[in-house]
Regions:
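Secondary-shell segments that build the walls of catalytic and ion/ligand-binding clefts
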Residues: 1-34, 99-262
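Short alpha-helical segments used as structural interaction elements across diverse proteins
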Residues: 42, 67, 88-90, 99, ...
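Short, Φ-rich (hydrophobic/aromatic) sequence segments
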Residues: 42, 92-93, 205-210
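Short capping loops/turns at secondary-structure boundaries
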Residues: 58, 65, 93-97, 169, ...
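Short, glycine/acidic-rich hinge or "gate" loops at secondary-structure transitions
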Residues: 65-67, 84-93, 227-236
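Internal, hydrophobic cores of structured domains that mediate oligomerization or house catalytic pockets
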Residues: 69-110
Length: 262
């Protein structure tokens, strides 16, 4: 069964808009600041996730669609948090190093256990030469609790959503994100006992969450890059890309364009 839902068309339409309007400007930037670089990497991760969702055209992929939609939502929250969390870029970079250190320490610990495999020189050197500096910086950023930090902001996802203080995002987190998590985590929840007719709805819910999150990302990137200052109709074209799949025929499309001032 092919997904013919309007949300799949929306996602494709928004990606086309992105490729024409936002992506070229992003890729044309030079000498990025640390926060700009973090924003760019996060934005590119969103793009690749969207590309994957667009390729998954069958309802049988409802679990993968849900997992990817969940990731896009989390990345969209990250982009918003970068605007408000102090030392965001430093925290993101340090957390990346901290995660690497955690993996290295686990490998070294395992290598010292019975039947453990020896670690490479790269791993042992990382543990020997970078551990002190990484943990010292982590202590500065998160205090003594740094070992329990699971996200660069220091907040769990629910807390991150609360930090943003956006009613729409809070609503989506409570009513949509959780159901996507059911398709991600082990257990019976999410699909057990459901009729076959439920799975297209699950796939469409995932696409809907992805559309909401991707639209938020594009709006943020337009604002951050200041594109609206040079092109007063860019938000109108974004709204067109979002709503065009709702139209039925050329007459409705022309009416929509007219209502948006295009």
């Amino acid at each position: 069964m092919e997904i013919v839902a309007v949300y799949h068309s929306m996602l494709t339409s928004l990606k086309t808009f992105d490729e024409l309007e936002v992506d070229p400007v992003c890729r044309g930037q030079i000498a990025l600041s640390p926060i700009e670089e973090c924003r760019m990497v996060t934005y590119l991760r969103v793009q690749r996730n969207v590309d994957s969702m667009i390729e998954l055209k069958h309802v049988a992929h409802f679990q993968a669609l849900s997992m990817i939609a969940r990731s896009i939502f989390e990345l969209s929250v990250d982009l918003r948090l970068m605007q408000s969390v102090p030392e965001a870029s430093e925290r993101m970079r340090c957390f990346q190093s901290l995660e690497s250190l955690r993996a290295v320490k686990a490998a070294v610990k395992r290598s010292n256990e019975p039947n453990g495999s020896p670690v490479s020189k790269t791993v042992s050197d990382f543990d020997a030469h970078r551990k002190v500096s990484i943990e010292a910086r982590a202590t500065q950023l998160w205090g003594a609790k740094f070992n329990s930090v699971t996200h660069w902001s220091g907040f769990k996802l629910g807390e991150r959503v609360s930090q943003i203080a956006d009613d729409q995002i809070s609503h989506v987190y409570i009513y949509a994100y959780r159901t996507m998590s059911w398709q991600t985590h082990p257990g019976l929840q999410g699909s057990y006992g459901l009729p076959a007719s439920a799975f297209p709805a699950i796939a469409n819910s995932a696409l809907n969450l992805a559309v909401f999150s991707y639209l938020a990302v594009l709006r943020l990137m337009i604002s951050t890059l200041g594109l609206q200052q040079h092109d007063r109709l860019i938000y109108a074209r974004l709204n067109l890309a979002h709503t065009l799949p709702y139209t039925d025929g050329q007459a409705e499309e022309l009416e929509l364009r007219h209502s948006l001032g295009l």
